[in-house]
Amino acid sequence: ESKSLIPATSVKGAISHRTAYHWNRFTKHFVDNAEAIASDRNKACLDIFGTTLDEGDIKPSRGKAIFSDVFIENTDSKVLPHIRVDKFTGGVMDGALFQEKVSTAENQELVEEIWVEKEALQDEDVRKAFEKALQDICDGLLPLGGGTNRGNGIFIGTLNIQE
């Protein structure tokens, strides 16, 4: 029996980036004033996800969040044919036909379990940024994976926080 997989690393990366975005927003670090802080130097990301950087006051640290892989059972799949368009002529390139198999899991409940050490969420802005990033996935605002312009990777759900 085949199953589709949503790897924890993919979800973790997307949530880390979105957490950095919301932390910058809450702390008024906007890109136009050159104070926006990238994910690898962002307080929220450092507190929750850790870093491999070793520069100045930033030291390597392990992440304080554990994400689970999600396996999707009983999925329907569609095979989508694609062609490659020649950018000079606008025509189809010879030998550039390929197919993509897409899993669909409409109306199927998926559970992504995330464990975070309490100390990582002590700062109010860090906690709010992380929770808002998670809520963005539940609201369908943060798609995961490729092909999102075709509607792939859109999730709608609920956020259940347990202390």
Language model: regions and residue ranges:
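Small/polar/charged residue-enriched interaction surfaces, especially the RNA/DNA-contacting tracks
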Residues: E1-E163
